[in-house]
C-alpha cells in the first residue's frame, strides 16, 4: 500500500473541504435572517449535513496522511466512518421529514439523503474490503472523498441560492 503516492490528492481535497467548511459557516450566518431557516430542525436537516460531509472529507485526508497506517487501521477507520455516515444520513432524512421551515422536493431528497447514503455505504464497503485489496481500496476511498466534496459543494450552493432568492423575511 503506497500511501505517499496519494499525498497531493489528499492535500488538495482536504484543504478544499476545510475551506468550504468555513464558507458554509458564512452561509449559515447569512441565513439567520431568513425566517424559514430559524427552525433549528431545518438547519439540522439541510445545513449541518454539509458541514459533516466536508469534515468527513477532511478526516479521510488526515487519516490517509498519518504516517505508519496499515490496511487494518485504515480499513477499520473507513468502516467506522462509513457506518457513522450511514447512521447520520438516516437521522438527516428523519429531520428533513420533521422540519417545517421548508418543503423538500425530489432534488433535496437525492442530494441530502440518497447520494450521501450511497456514498457513506460505499465508504463502509471500501473500508471492509481494504483488508483484502488495500491498493484498490485507496481508489474507491478517493472516489468517496470526491463524491462527498461535490455533494457538499452542491448543497452549500443550493443553500446560498435559497437564502439569496428568499430575501429577508
Question: What spans do the regions from the language model cover?
Answer:
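Core segments of alpha-helical transmembrane spans in multipass integral membrane proteins
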Residues: 19, 23, 47-62, 79-90
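Membrane-interface helix-loop junction between the first two transmembrane segments
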Residues: 24-44
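Membrane-proximal helix-loop-helix units in multi-pass membrane proteins
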Residues: 63-120
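Terminal transmembrane helical module of multi-pass membrane proteins
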Residues: 122-169
Amino acid at each position: 500500500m503506497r500511501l505517499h503516492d496519494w499525498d497531493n490528492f489528499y492535500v488538495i481535497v482536504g484543504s478544499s473541504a476545510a475551506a468550504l467548511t468555513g464558507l458554509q459557516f458564512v452561509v449559515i450566518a447569512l441565513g439567520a435572517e431568513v425566517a424559514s431557516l430559524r427552525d433549528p430542525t431545518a438547519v439540522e436537516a439541510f445545513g449541518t449535513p454539509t458541514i459533516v460531509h466536508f469534515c468527513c472529507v477532511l478526516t479521510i485526508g488526515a487519516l490517509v496522511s498519518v504516517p505508519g497506517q496499515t490496511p487494518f487501521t485504515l480499513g477499520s477507520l473507513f468502516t467506522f466512518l462509513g457506518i457513522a455516515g450511514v447512521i447520520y444520513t438516516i437521522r438527516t432524512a428523519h429531520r428533513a421529514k420533521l422540519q417545517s421551515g421548508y418543503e423538500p422536493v425530489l432534488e433535496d431528497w437525492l442530494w441530502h439523503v440518497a447520494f450521501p447514503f450511497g456514498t457513506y455505504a460505499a465508504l463502509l464497503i471500501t473500508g471492509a474490503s481494504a483488508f483484502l485489496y488495500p491498493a484498490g481500496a485507496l481508489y474507491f476511498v478517493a472516489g468517496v472523498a470526491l463524491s462527498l466534496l461535490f455533494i457538499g459543494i452542491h448543497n452549500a450552493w443550493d443553500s446560498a441560492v435559497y437564502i439569496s432568492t428568499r430575501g429577508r423575511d
